[in-house]
Amino acid sequence: MATQPTPLTAVVLAAGQGTRMKSARPKVLHELCGRPMLHYVVDAALAAGASDVVVVVGHGRDEVSAALDKAFGAQGKKVRTALQPQQRGTGDAVRCAMPHIDATSEAILILCGDTPLLDPEQLTQLRGALDRAGDAPIAMLTAEVSDPTGYGRILRDASGRVIGIREHKDATAEERAITEVNPGVYLARSGFLGRALAGLTTDNAQGELYLTDIVAQAAKAGGAAAVVARDVGSLVGINDRAQLAAAEEVLYGRIADRLRKSGVTIRTSARIDAGVLVEPDAVIEHAVVLRGRTRVGAGARIDVGSVLTDVVVEAGASVKPYTVASQSSIGAGAQIGPFSHLRPESQIEADAHIGNFVETKKTVVRKGAKANHLAYLGDGDIGEGANVGAGTIFCNYDGFRKHRTEIGAGAFIGSDSQIVAPVKIGAGAYVATGTTVTRDVPDEALAIGRVKQENKEGYATRLKARLKDAAKK
């Protein structure tokens, strides 16, 4: 009869700030393939058989907790948080989690929240190693790497038994030459872990409570079972934007391989010129091209297939798929696209909307103004809060010269209107649908210039009969 695996709880360490990310967002909430990295770690723990997951939060705890609740809230108490009030080391972080662990859990799986490539199969192997380890109170993953800089080194005795871990900053020159390292994945028996955490001290180079020190205690209490990881890449932690990008490429590769095997062709790329500047927390999606002196502000999003040349995009703006823009500016919180075309000298101010199949040229669209569908807006000034309906055309060219159109704040331009420049439409004015405007419209006035509708009863029947007879001849 097969032995039942040990019931376990996972503890995920996610309290760190991640200063090398240079971001206001907590490190573990940075996304890969559309999901925060932390969610991949939680998924791996659950897939490896954890009955519940305790995530230790600290920096940005409200944001992290909210993100977890949104993603895993439907699972009730299966995923919950524990607060680490001060960053006093990984050992202290696990201490903070202990009161939140169910008393029925016999083992505790400890993971880092910045390792989104974790393979659940490797975690399952670790679980099996602890079950086979007899009296050993802990099992851990180790990895052989070519450059161990920054990692804790695995210390073994003459017989090859693991006797401890030495953090890089505390290691001697001889110990730093060791290439077997600690990737930070442990599975410890609950009773042992509680006692070991109580025995931790801050007698080290960083003055912190090192979780790694529990391995030396385990070696004296029955041994530490070590499983050498076959896939070292899956254990890599994310500390900066370059590592985030590399990990995302791995994840995209996994997704692409799966889809390609099902018959899908996938091509992904982004091209960014050397002169382009992009601020923290901006998102540049696939197949985006950023050229020249383009600037993208903090938190802005440039979506799939967009091409921007010498464009300033302010903080929080959204450029939706397949937008083309050049020598223009997009204000904070503005929304552009999809399928918009901003030609040179377009100025889209804060919170304005330029929608699908709208073209602008030498036009100012002031704060909160909207042109959401099918319009040409050339040589114009559209006032704050004005609305330009679908099918509106600024008739700005007489064959020899360009002329300007001015629309006042809060004005409403009905669909399928033609504005023959030069012309001014006053603040709060209303242009009826289908109107051709050739003269100035005063403030709060209604301009209507369409032909009066006439209904001829029975005419359609007679017309169709006549056309049918003509077709027979």
Swiss-Prot record:
N-acetyltransferase, as annotated region: 263-473
Location(s), subcellular: Cytoplasm
Domain of life: Bacteria
Residues at which acetyl-CoA binds: 390, 396-397, 415, 433, 450
Residues given in the record as UDP-N-acetyl-alpha-D-glucosamine binding sites: 13-16, 27, 84, 89-90, 152, 167, 182, 239, 343, 361, 376, 387
UniProt binding sites for Mg(2+): 114, 239
Alphabetized GO MF terms: glucosamine-1-phosphate N-acetyltransferase activity; magnesium ion binding; UDP-N-acetylglucosamine diphosphorylase activity
Cofactor: Mg(2+)
Active site (catalytic residues): 373 (proton acceptor)
Pathway(s) this gene product operates in, as recorded in its UniProt entry: Nucleotide-sugar biosynthesis; UDP-N-acetyl-alpha-D-glucosamine biosynthesis; N-acetyl-alpha-D-glucosamine 1-phosphate from alpha-D-glucosamine 6-phosphate (route II): step 2/2; Nucleotide-sugar biosynthesis; UDP-N-acetyl-alpha-D-glucosamine biosynthesis; UDP-N-acetyl-alpha-D-glucosamine from N-acetyl-alpha-D-glucosamine 1-phosphate: step 1/1; Bacterial outer membrane biogenesis; LPS lipid A biosynthesis
Entry keyword Iron: no
Catalyses which reaction(s): alpha-D-glucosamine 1-phosphate + acetyl-CoA = N-acetyl-alpha-D-glucosamine 1-phosphate + CoA + H(+); N-acetyl-alpha-D-glucosamine 1-phosphate + UTP + H(+) = UDP-N-acetyl-alpha-D-glucosamine + diphosphate
One GO process term, biological-process aspect: peptidoglycan biosynthetic process
Protein EC: 2.7.7.23, 2.3.1.157
Function per UniProt: Catalyzes the last two sequential reactions in the de novo biosynthetic pathway for UDP-N-acetylglucosamine (UDP-GlcNAc). The C-terminal domain catalyzes the transfer of acetyl group from acetyl coenzyme A to glucosamine-1-phosphate (GlcN-1-P) to produce N-acetylglucosamine-1-phosphate (GlcNAc-1-P), which is converted into UDP-GlcNAc by the transfer of uridine 5-monophosphate (from uridine 5-triphosphate), a reaction catalyzed by the N-terminal domain.
Protein name as it appears in the record: Bifunctional protein GlmU
Source organism (scientific name): Sorangium cellulosum (strain So ce56) (Polyangium cellulosum (strain So ce56))
Organism lineage string: Bacteria, Pseudomonadati, Myxococcota, Polyangia, Polyangiales
Gene that encodes it: glmU
